[in-house]
Amino acid sequence: MTLNPAARLLPVLLALALVLAGCRPLQVFAPRSPALNLAGPPPDVVVLAVSGRCGPPCRAPRDNWDYLGSRGTLDAVAGAIAAQGYRVQVAGYADSALASFQPLKVVAPQRGYAALAADFARMKAHWFRAPGVRPPRLVLLGHSHGSVWTHYLAQVNPDVPFALMIDLDGICASWNLDHQRDLRAHPVEAPGQPRAIDACNLVRVGRGMVRLKDVVPLNVAHDLEVQSKRLPAYRSDSGGFFVNYLFEVTLNVRPDGSSAGIERFVSVREDHSAVSYPNSDALKWVLERTASLVAGWKQGSASPLNPGSVP
């Protein structure tokens, strides 16, 4: 059978369309929640979110971006808190050591950990150390590498209480490969602080060894840990693959090896990426548990691990 010229061109055109689609910049949406405003009075709650590594085809960390803010995950967490009458402000950051960088896959410049550290330093000065100012409660949200950054932030700020930490399948894979060059050229740690490049190193906790990103510091009152599926399973509404390509298996622990204040959910239908979407089984669990914990704030409860929490 002889194909006409149009039929012969069809596979080429389809391949070209796929290539062009892969090169097309991603559409990024700003969170709908009020943005962090360090020039104004403090809100009741601040939610800081750090996204993880970009999905293929991309080149990390150059093409990493703040997808938790864009896809509505940050808004979902902020909304669960705001629904109980709290004034909430949010800020989202990308998986990078740099303060600002321009990925090829998105149009808008992205802000990395150095920007988060600078924002946090201003927050401490204006809202936590200024006399007569009631500081906000702090909530940390991280996915994949983002959880490495949020754990590091809490670890190097032991004088600041965090009301809640949310870990969505925190992963250390490619941490050193992605970040060692930028962290060597632009260190983000203050003098005397642990190095950020060591945030995935193994440390002894109790009788075992775990990575630093799996340690929940004592200045964090509660930790909600999500892990993605281990076995092949049909996907949920948030999409993903039948077979998971990357997943966390280590359980978060306290520095003494206990699990005090830590809750865990294994999402048996969702892969590493799918758990980060607002319509996922994982986020449904996170939002339910967040709402329950926030209800406890109204009663003035404080964790025994963190007696200095803002009532």
Which role fits each region the language model picked out?
Residues D119-R235:
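Serine-dependent carboxylesterase/thioesterase catalytic core
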Residues P31-L36, L74-V77, G206-L212:
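Alpha-helical scaffolding within the catalytic cores
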Residues K213-P311:
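C-terminal catalytic-base region of ester-bond hydrolases, centering on the histidine
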Residues R62-W65, G69, A80, Q84, ...:
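Disulfide-rich extracellular domains of secreted proteins
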Residues T2-P11:
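Bacterial N-terminal signal peptides that target proteins for export
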Residues A35-P135:
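Active-site catalytic motif of lipid deacylating hydrolases and related acyltransferases
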